Amino acid sequence: MESSGNPESTTFFYYDLQSQPCENQAWVFATLATTVLYCLVFLLSLVGNSLVLWVLVKYESLESLTNIFILNLCLSDLVFACLLPVWISPYHWGWVLGDFLCKLLNMIFSISLYSSIFFLTIMTIHRYLSVVSPLSTLRVPTLRCRVLVTMAVWVASILSSILDTIFHKVLSSGCDYSELTWYLTSVYQHNLFFLLSLGIILFCYVEILRTLFRSRSKRRHRTVKLIFAIVVAYFLSWGPYNFTLFLQTLFRTQIIRSCEAKQQLEYALLICRNLAFSHCCFNPVLYVFVGVKFRTHLKHVLRQFWFCRLQAPSPASIPHSPGAFAYEGASFY
């Protein structure tokens, strides 16, 4: 991240609303709006994802791979949300945290970013196998299998973030890419992963829908709905931002030189970036509206909390039987 006062900045997240005096008011509004939004998203994500983690650990079985994937998505969103207050500070004071934290925080940011898309992709592949070829996922995965899959995704995320870690440094513009080449490479890499995962997920859901239309099992229909909602929310949030980042590379490489178009892109990048960064608080909302089991568990948790405050006996616990769900269903159906 960076202080936005330098129009030559090459950082991944840069947009320049301050390059012209007439844009001063727009910049002040953008700074205020982003500060308020990030603080709100941080609080919502912290509360929402913490509740999801509590429900998963207390009421659900972690022998299910789908539960493991959702748990890791929550962790990834929590890490992402905890970085939002850090990204506010450059708007007001520039980068004041030094070179080491510049590299470290951008590495953590990238790991969180890539882990989300990798877990969504592998969760969709797992759902595809469960629906299209249910016998292949009927057996409960061993602890070793669950650990290996989780570790593989996090290791892949760390390796994917190496570029952002090495080539970020503190410059006059703030915490920034050291050269335009590395900025372009990073954008293209992220766009590539985004498009590959989108292609894989689209293929899986086409096959899933074809199978479900031939099946009369309402259970199987329910097992797809929440994951589909999570995936759609992710791509609707991050898709516009990835597209505007790609358009920005056309200006940086001077393929497009229109000043008016560039200014419009800066506004679009501001809006799309704030939408994308708000995604970390969306999943708990989806669990409430789409996940029947999560709603039930959440009501029970809130009732317990309320009865605790009134110093009255809490209602009877919801029965919960450990073990994998049929067809390795998602937690919150």
From Swiss-Prot:
Annotated GO biological process: calcium-mediated signaling; cell chemotaxis; chemotaxis; G protein-coupled receptor signaling pathway; G protein-coupled receptor signaling pathway, coupled to cyclic nucleotide second messenger; immune response; inflammatory response; positive regulation of cytosolic calcium ion concentration
Topology in membrane: Multi-pass membrane protein
One GO location term (cellular component): plasma membrane
PROSITE patterns recorded: G_PROTEIN_RECEP_F1_1 (PS00237), G_PROTEIN_RECEP_F1_2 (PS50262)
Main location: membrane
Keyword Disulfide bond: yes
Gene3D superfamilies: Rhodopsin 7-helix transmembrane proteins
Transmembrane regions: 32-59, 70-89, 104-125, 143-167, 191-209, 226-250, 268-291
Disulfide linkage: C102-C175
Record keyword Protein biosynthesis present: no
Residue intervals on the Cytoplasmic side: 60-69, 126-142, 210-225, 292-333
Topology feature Extracellular, residues: 1-31, 90-103, 168-190, 251-267
Organism domain of life: Eukaryota
Key words of the record: Cell membrane, Disulfide bond, G-protein coupled receptor, Membrane, Receptor, Transducer, Transmembrane, Transmembrane helix
CDD domains associated with the record: 7tmA_XCR1 (cd15182)
Membership in a protein family: Belongs to the G-protein coupled receptor 1 family.
Protein name from the UniProt record: Chemokine XC receptor 1
Organism: Homo sapiens
